[in-house]
Amino acid sequence: MKIVDKYTYPRSSRAKLAGLRHYTVDGEEKLLPSVTTILGQTQPKEKQDSLEKWRQKVGLREAQKITRDAAIRGTAMHKYLEDLIRGQRSLDLTPLGVEATRMAEIIVDRGLNDCSEIYGIEATLYYPGLYAGSCDLIAKYKDKVSIIDFKQTNKPKQREWIEDYFLQMAAYGMAHDAVYGLSLIHI
């Protein structure tokens, strides 16, 4: 796996507007809402209700702990993978760090090892004037230019529960196509 300078991804920064994540992107005049913000704001009521039911079932304090631990684990997993791609090694010996490392190694074994070229790490993608986001990796995966986003989970998820992941990747693919003229159908 080698890093190849094939595309020039813009610099960006994140900002909150009315409590929602937006991006400032070089070359864009206005703040662009993040893909995840748009998906969160357009979530079906049933999905919002099921999350609230879960919070009530486990209790607010436990729900906050589970959410916080998942965020810590996800951040540690991403750091491990990004460092690995850049040829560095990171070691987090905290209990959540050890879990994150195990999750990251599964991603390496089941997918990252099949990436031959890396075009972008934590790359900003934006659809001019509409939205922006940051994907974890743009790489040649099994000989196809692909957008890759690392996801961590505590339990296996059913396909219908992760529809937002597919919508997020489709939005990133459309953004890449709009800016670089390359249709990415492998997400």
Q: Which residues does each PLM region occupy?
A:
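Active-site metal-coordination segments of metallo-dependent hydrolases
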Residues: 158-166
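An active-site-proximal "capping" alpha-helix that borders the catalytic cofactor pocket
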Residues: 165-175
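Metal-dependent nuclease catalytic cores that hydrolyze phosphodiester bonds in DNA/RNA
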Residues: 1-132
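Active-site catalytic microenvironments for nucleophilic, acid-base chemistry
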Residues: 83-87, 174-179
